[in-house]
Amino acid sequence: MRVLSVDHVSYTYPQQNMPAVNDVDFSLERGSYTAVVGLNGSGKSTLARILCGLLDADCGEVSYASGVRSALVFQSPKDQIICSVVFRDTAFGPQNLALPPDEVELRTIESLAVVGLLHKASSPSVTLSLGQTQKEALAGIIAIDPDVIILDEALSMLDPDSKNDIFAFLSYWIRKGRTVVHITHDIDAIRKAQDVIAMEKGKIVYSGTTDDFFTDTELCERITGEKIVKSVFKKNNKNAMKFSAVSNMPDAEAARRTIVC
């Protein structure tokens, strides 16, 4: 089932001559994981903002299937932190969906457990490290359970173990039928994806499977700016970690509290 269609979308920033996004056209299916890749200035972050409605395209159309909800996780996590305490901030989204208090609490605990911040639930947000703040922002998005999640370099500040935990969750999430769009230039992140959309100067120059993208070494190196060793590449999800049920977390009960924001 198609969840997102991008129909010949273009966007030029005010007082700029060249479009940041130029005649971009693609569609995404439910349960897919697509990496949107390119060097700085290629237009991928601008595209992310158009997909989430933060920017209006000059021409073309972005359309979601009926009832589909999308969410964006920014590269700078502080742009998304609203409340002063980690638990309250993560609960903010579910609360504004008018969910029952028990459901808000459950989603908040599960989301913090997924990103490895359950032990920081009662901590002030300002006391977190930059990497932990990025996890907090991601937890807040996970808690609203969007159908499409757009990650704009949102894992760039995480350590390798934390990244693996998030990738494991995303793999589980995709199996539930959710769709992931990952704006990135990180080779490891690209390898986790099923498909790749490569951008240069605002245009799509490649759209296809991850395997085929890495097979075209010249294109891959030009788009990522990295030297690619073919023998190192492994097909997607080979290293995916198994998702651990949140109910098994020993400190989950300790995080339960009255949610006020």
Predicted feature descriptions by range:
Residues M1-V3, S10-D23:
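A short, flexible loop at the N-terminus of ABC-type nucleotide-binding domains that lies
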Residues V37-L39:
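The feature captures the beta-strand-to-loop junction immediately N-terminal to the Walker
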Residues C52:
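Helix-to-loop junction immediately C-terminal to a conserved catalytic motif
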Residues D102-K120:
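Conserved ABC ATPase "signature" region
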Residues P124-L128, Q132:
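Conserved ABC ATPase signature
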Residues I183-H185:
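H-loop/switch region of ABC-family ATPase nucleotide-binding domains
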Residues K203-E226:
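Conserved beta-strand-loop-alpha-helix hinge in the C-terminal portion
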